[in-house]
Amino acid sequence: MIRSSIVILSLLLISHLVSAKVLLIGNSTSLSFDDVEATFTPMIKRSDQGGVLYVAEPLDACSDLVNTVNVKNGTTVSPPYVLIIRGGCSFEDKIRNAQKAGYKAAIVYDYEDFGFLVSMAGNPSGVLIYGTFVSKATGEVLKEYAGRTDFEVWLMPSFETSAWSIMAISFISLLAMSAVLATCFFVRRHRVRRRRILALNGNDFHRMPKSMIIRMPTTIFNGICDEATTSILCCICLENYEKGDKLRILPCHHKFHVACVDLWLGQRKSFCPVCKRDARSISTDKPPSEHTPFLSRTPSMTPTSSFLLSSSSTTPLQSSHELPISIRVDPSLPSTSMQPHTVPMYLSHSRSHTSFQNGSNRFSRPIPVSRSSADLRNAVSQRSYNSPHQVSLPRFLHSRYTHILGPGNASRSQVVGLLTSQREHSLHQNDSRRSFIHFASASSLPGW
């Protein structure tokens, strides 16, 4: 719709720009006719003089004209205009023959009344006279006054046309600017909308530049596999690593062939093919393995009481505020003294235990006590504790309670009571007493 409107306005603009007026002025007579200027002749810019009109011989002016400039009483009637009929040859031939005969302007009229005027076209090279096209009716009227020296023909430029042309040009310019602005607006809106959709879908991963990829660390595979999931084969090409292969390490600590991962990051997406982590991020975290804790040290975690089931050798504590706890099963006790779903437990120090620390945020899950005593008795190696010295106590407990109990005189109930009171004090400081409800008193340890 917009394109068709622009084309129509352009045609109207062209037709108005080349249009002019033919005036026939004589004794008390003035006639005006519409005409269209030729496109290959000089444009009529002013009307400072007129000329006498003559009829061409031959009328179609397809050959050299017989009648040239008329000479009367030794004076030259100047400038003469010639009237030519359409047809027989091209407009360019008619205009050139009229120019050769010495005429200043050529007026071509139509041989049929089509109702509209046409614009004459041709090669403008060497054409110096004016040329206009009029209708059949205008040509017949002008033919009646041809050869009369008391009547002159004037070719007038249309000043009204200039105003129309200015308005048309302004309107077309405004329309074009509006179309360009609307196109830019809709294109920008589409791009913003597409970016939002990609961001919501989580697909806002772009390709990484080669400079960032080269800065990532690399390593040489020596045949030793670590705990990482990508330490055996490349998850991109699915080929096992061979000794001497060059591997690239991503920020998530996953490893791949250098050629494979460089092609992936440079031409596909900027995330890890395994864990989908953005490779553009920087991380100093160690890769997860069997030696790293299950729970990371984050401020969002709440303190939780924890103790681990372990059978490793005991080592001294690092701080006087730590109270390690481990759970052991005494297989030497008779099975008749055990209640269903209860397990007799001892307290000993283990190197792999997590200590209770004031203000610490790193804890493990509590171990449930409701387990079968038979299963635990079969899983744990048999050990017997015949004296209170075999109860693995921390150094600060030995130094604190030796002068009270005395070596060799402490009973199990006394040791458990002292340890229970100390444990309750530590649990109160760590705000996790609820998790140790089964160990709040010595009565919860059967068989002691």
Swiss-Prot record:
SUPFAM superfamilies: PA domain, RING/U-box. GO terms for molecular function: zinc ion binding. SMART domains: RING (SM00184). Glycans are attached at residues 27, 73. Disulfide bonds join 62-89. The keyword NAD does not apply. Residues 281-315 are annotated as: Disordered. Residues 21-165 are lumenal. It comes from the Eukaryota. Keywords: Disulfide bond, Glycoprotein, Membrane, Metal-binding, Protein transport, Signal, Transmembrane, Transmembrane helix, Transport, Vacuole, Zinc, Zinc-finger. Residues 298-315 have a biased composition (Low complexity). It is found in: Prevacuolar compartment membrane; Protein storage vacuole membrane. The chain crosses the membrane at residues 166-186. Residues 187-448 are cytoplasmic. GO terms for biological process: protein transport. A zinc finger (RING-type) spans 234-276. Its main location: membrane. Residues 74-146 form the PA domain. One of its GO terms (cellular component) is endomembrane system. Residues 1-20 form the signal peptide. It is a single-pass type I membrane protein. Involved in the trafficking of vacuolar proteins. May function as a sorting receptor for protein trafficking to the protein storage vacuole (PSV). This is Receptor homology region, transmembrane domain- and RING domain-containing protein 4. The gene is RMR4.
